[in-house]
């Protein structure tokens, strides 16, 4: 699933190419792509017709397009395999929605697994920010200028469960998925099974700082692409997968100490870690 860096790469691409453009005809090619828009496909297409895009924004793994003179936004969730693509014509297999812009560009939403989609949602003011209603419950992410690491540390120190579980909880801190959780924990030298309330403030701060740092590094390299499911708006893959220190490196040498990296099951996922740098907690 695209995590914060990948979604931010897409948002930046959209901001550069669609802000100031007006939406013309919109076609929904697969109803699942608009299943979160409760009023249905016809309502979505009618309300988008003639809307001018004035900006883009993101929180965690959600992004949205701001529309001129409206108190609603077009919310996009990429799900497992969603792609926002720009071109003269719909340019990908699995195109679920296409929108013609006034300069002739087609904005396409492609989604092989159909877990993502578009919806129009009301904008709300929450904690000093204006966000779409489906995003209102999400915590700020580590790249948000108003992210308060000290406040998150206080929350984590009240959580009696694994630190990795907390990093994946979008109501504690948003935008972090399995890949960047493992990378942050490796950088901070903390095993994901450590209990959050047993970690010191210094350790928890180190984990959050590492999460922000690794996502900035990933963003600079276009995100992480293991296959063709994640690409930017031009259809190009990111290349941070070449720089991963933990995720996917079972059996390889730790880049820091040389120990053999391990993999274990966690929450129906795989966790990758160094047994020397990140010793597993004793039961």
Swiss-Prot record:
MF annotations from Gene Ontology: 8-oxo-7,8-dihydroguanine DNA N-glycosylase activity; class I DNA-(apurinic or apyrimidinic site) endonuclease activity; damaged DNA binding; zinc ion binding
A Pfam family recorded for this sequence: H2TH
Co-factor note (free text): Binds 1 zinc ion per subunit.
Segments forming FPG-type zinc fingers: 245-279
Keywords: DNA damage, DNA repair, DNA-binding, Glycosidase, Hydrolase, Lyase, Metal-binding, Multifunctional enzyme, Zinc, Zinc-finger
SUPFAM superfamilies for this protein: Glucocorticoid receptor-like (DNA-binding domain), N-terminal domain of MutM-like DNA repair proteins, S13-like H2TH domain
Residues that coordinate or bind DNA: 94, 113, 159
Highest taxon above the source species: Bacteria
Cofactor: Zn(2+)
CDD domains from the UniProt entry: EcFpg-like_N
Its EC number(s): 3.2.2.23, 4.2.99.18
UniProt entry tagged with the keyword Coiled coil: no
Primary role: Involved in base excision repair of DNA damaged by oxidation or by mutagenic agents. Acts as a DNA glycosylase that recognizes and removes damaged bases. Has a preference for oxidized purines, such as 7,8-dihydro-8-oxoguanine (8-oxoG). Has AP (apurinic/apyrimidinic) lyase activity and introduces nicks in the DNA strand. Cleaves the DNA backbone by beta-delta elimination to generate a single-strand break at the site of the removed base with both 3'- and 5'-phosphates.
Assembly notes: Monomer.
Family of this protein: Belongs to the FPG family.
PANTHER family linked: FORMAMIDOPYRIMIDINE-DNA GLYCOSYLASE
The protein's name: Formamidopyrimidine-DNA glycosylase
Organism: Mycobacterium avium (strain 104)
High-level lineage: Bacteria, Bacillati, Actinomycetota, Actinomycetes, Mycobacteriales
């Amino acid at each position: 699933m695209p995590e914060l860096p990948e979604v931010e790469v897409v948002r930046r691409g959209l901001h550069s190419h669609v802000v100031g453009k007006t939406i013309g005809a919109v076609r929904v090619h697969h109803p699942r792509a608009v299943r979160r828009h409760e009023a249905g496909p016809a309502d979505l297409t009618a309300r988008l017709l003639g809307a001018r895009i004035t900006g883009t924004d993101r929180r965690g793994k959600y992004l949205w397009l701001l529309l001129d003179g409206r108190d609603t936004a077009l919310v996009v969730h990429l799900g497992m395999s969603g792609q926002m693509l720009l071109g003269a014509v719909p340019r990908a297999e699995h195109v679920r929605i296409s929108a013609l812009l006034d300069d002739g560009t087609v904005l396409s939403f492609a989604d092989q697994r159909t877990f993502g989609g578009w919806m129009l949602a009301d904008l709300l003011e929450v904690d000093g920010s204006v966000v779409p209603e489906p995003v209102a419950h999400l915590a700020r992410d580590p790249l948000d200028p108003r992210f308060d690491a000290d406040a998150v540390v206080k929350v984590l120190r009240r959580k009696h469960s694994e630190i990795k579980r907390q990093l994946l909880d979008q109501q504690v801190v948003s935008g972090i998925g399995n890949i960047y959780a493992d990378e942050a924990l490796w950088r901070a030298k903390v095993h994901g099974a450590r209990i959050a309330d047993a970690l010191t403030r210094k350790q928890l701060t180190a984990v959050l700082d590492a999460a922000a740092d690794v996502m900035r590094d990933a963003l600079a390299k276009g995100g992480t692409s293991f296959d063709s499911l994640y690409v930017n708006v031009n259809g190009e893959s990111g290349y941070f997968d070449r720089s991963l220190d933990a995720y996917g490196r079972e059996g390889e040498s730790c880049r820091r100490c040389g120990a053999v990296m391990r993999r274990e099951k966690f929450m129906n996922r795989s966790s990758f870690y160094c047994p020397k740098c990140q010793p597993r907690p004793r039961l």
